[in-house]
Amino acid sequence: ADGFISCVAALCAIRICPAVKDYVITSHKSKEPATMIILEALDIPVFLDCDMCLGEGTGAVTIYPILDMALAVYGGMCTFSDNQMENYVPLV
């Protein structure tokens, strides 16, 4: 969901078919005053808070490269054993 209007549409879709929630990505928190009400109702984490306004359409364009990078790191990062290192152990 990219901003207020698409978050409202996502909430409507979820109310019709709750399974839809598993497929909704909320890209950013819009500056629209009602956005927080909708986001609280959706109960889905928001990735960005960049003061973007209604209708810009930049949230989705911004979030997908970030998701691609995160997946690349997750899928391609070496493990401790790959690097012949001991596993991390918290000090406390």
How would you label these PLM feature ranges?
Residues 3-92:
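A generic structural signal for tightly packed, nonpolar segments enriched in small/aliphatic residues
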